[in-house]
Amino acid sequence: MAKYQCSVCKYIHEGELTEDFKCPICKQPASKFVEVKDAPKNPYAGTKTEQNLWAAFAGESQARHKSTYFASVAKKAGYEQIAALFLQTAENEKEHAKLWFKALGELGDTAQNLLHAAEGENYEWTDMYDTFAKEADEEGFHDLAAQFRGVAAIEKSHEERYRALLNNVETKQVFEKSGVTVWECRNCGHLVVGVAAPEKCPVCNHPQAYFEVRKENY
């Protein structure tokens, strides 16, 4: 299926463009769209090196998480220096993993990353954990099967959250809503009532990026 990108707001449209078509985001006409040609996301596609990059990414990612868990154990045991070194190493491993993830062409813009994340969560709750739970039940590990299903339900909510955030990004509603909203500065706590968050916090001068819709759950 053909893909076209709006040259103004970068919205991607799948399918042919009609003469009266307008961008759903910025309302530009079809003439402002250019066809997007699919290409490999990385120069290593289909090679052994690509497989090695994925293996390196997985290994570094696991090492990073293990180090954070080990740091927690060391801290509880009273070994502050060892805990700190575990955490320092974890940060190193995170950067190593990022190198290989970027080389694989997997790090996109925020909209692409939200979609990627949502698709990953969808796989986890619809396929991966469902299969794991069934196999655990078959082997008699019923408590673990219940945990797999419990985590699957959480992953489902994660997918829903990512898709809601993606919709906000695509429709430009991250910092502007259709009605009056209470906005809170994530840095200093200043509250603003209005349709949109201010360009800058009038109290601490942090930019609009620090504002979010105020929420109370107590």
What are these regions, as identified by a protein language model?
Residues 2-218:
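Non-heme di-metal
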